Amino acid sequence: MKYSEIMVRHGELSTKGKNRMRFINRLKANIQDVLSAYPEVTVRSTRDRTHVLLNGADDRSVIEALKPVFGIQGLSPVYKVEKSVPVLIAAVQEIMSSLYREGLTFKISSKRSDHQFELDSRDLNHTLGAAVFEALPHIKAQMKNPDVTLKVEIRDEAAYLSHEDIKGAGGLPVGASGKGMLMLSGGIDSPVAGYLSLKRGVEIEAVHFASPPYTSPGALRKAKDLTQRLTRFGGNIQFIEVPFTEIQEEIKHKAPEAYLMTLTRRFMLRITDAIREKRKALVIINGESLGQVASQTLESMQAINAVTSTPIIRPVVAMDKLEIIDIAQQIDTFDISIQPFEDCCTIFAPDRPKTNPKLANVERYESRFDVDGLVERAVAGIRVTEITPEIETDSLSTLIEELL
């Protein structure tokens, strides 16, 4: 027998009261995005669960695509059959025969929401269990911790059989908690910050600053590849490329070297905030980890944050670098993040950046610039690309094509 669908059990959605269907519909849309590479698959949601109808698609590939999606508590590949006793007996015998090995233990666990069905759960357990013994005389029944628990569910529309329970990613469906702008540098920390925000239901748009010719097409490709890795957790992500060359050249020529990083980060934050307002997001997200680099001391954060009153979420702020790396490896962003391409935060990095910048000094140096004009031109020049979770192509080949 072939699996007919994947049954998705909802995670924290069961606690969301009046918003429950909104959250479920959000999860359904995210699943559809993640499974866009499987056009034959259809998705149907109810208050209790979501049904992913395979329609001939490979069940293992679909399961692997669903496992990282936030909002899913668990997955079970199921066989959908007619809800008649003879059909159920034949199905149970076929399934258990395919699983049988010497010494295997099993139990049947039935439940019914269709109370018009001819057998109650207890009688159905006995009938189907007897059918298994008829087909496999040497198999053993075991009520506690058997090797196989064959679940049989009688619903209004059909009967469903399953014997696998696969753990989902948990969390909330991406988008259920609103939208935030992720400042995505291309390093190790910011993709992890994006991942942790996605887990709590925040839809992210990735804001990446590019300064050609100082930053290369490879650096831009790297940031897009990181964004694509993040799409596995909740579907499509808007990638926003910000032209930053003019601003970085201005800062380099007009400000003291020790303040380059502070001024650069203040401009980045202003621009991200302007894009956030334009695109109706609620928060800014970044990968700052306290004390990790000069711009991430409390004094630096205070001086940089002074340009906005928008909430800034820092999911990795209290993590050690090794903790962040561990998550990056788990979500498959680490190998991309360590590719040796320069980004906007490294190309003009001073040898001795200020770790305790005085706000009065920062504002005095900033008075040398046309701040509003620089920000407006950067925002006007953004390029937005929708990144999807389609099957990835070789990044090097893609980069060569772009260069040609």
From Swiss-Prot:
Instruction: Please report the stretch or stretches of sequence annotated as the THUMP domain.
Output: 60-165
Keyword entries, A-Z: ATP-binding, Cytoplasm, Nucleotide-binding, RNA-binding, Thiamine biosynthesis, Transferase, tRNA-binding
The catalytic activity of this protein is classed by the Enzyme Commission as 2.8.1.4
Q: List the signal peptide residues.
A: none
InterPro entries, per the entry: Rossmann-like_a/b/a_fold, ThiI_AANH, ThiI_fer, ThiI_N, THUMP_dom, THUMP_ThiI, tRNA_STrfase, tRNA_sulfurtransferase_ThiI
Q: Name one Pfam family in it.
A: THUMP
The record, for PROSITE patterns, names: THUMP (PS51165)
Q: Which GO terms describe its biological process?
A: thiamine biosynthetic process; thiamine diphosphate biosynthetic process; thiazole biosynthetic process; tRNA 4-thiouridine biosynthesis
Q: What does this protein do?
A: Catalyzes the ATP-dependent transfer of a sulfur to tRNA to produce 4-thiouridine in position 8 of tRNAs, which functions as a near-UV photosensor. Also catalyzes the transfer of sulfur to the sulfur carrier protein ThiS, forming ThiS-thiocarboxylate. This is a step in the synthesis of thiazole, in the thiamine biosynthesis pathway. The sulfur is donated as persulfide by IscS.
UniProt name for this protein: Probable tRNA sulfurtransferase
Q: Which gene encodes it?
A: thiI
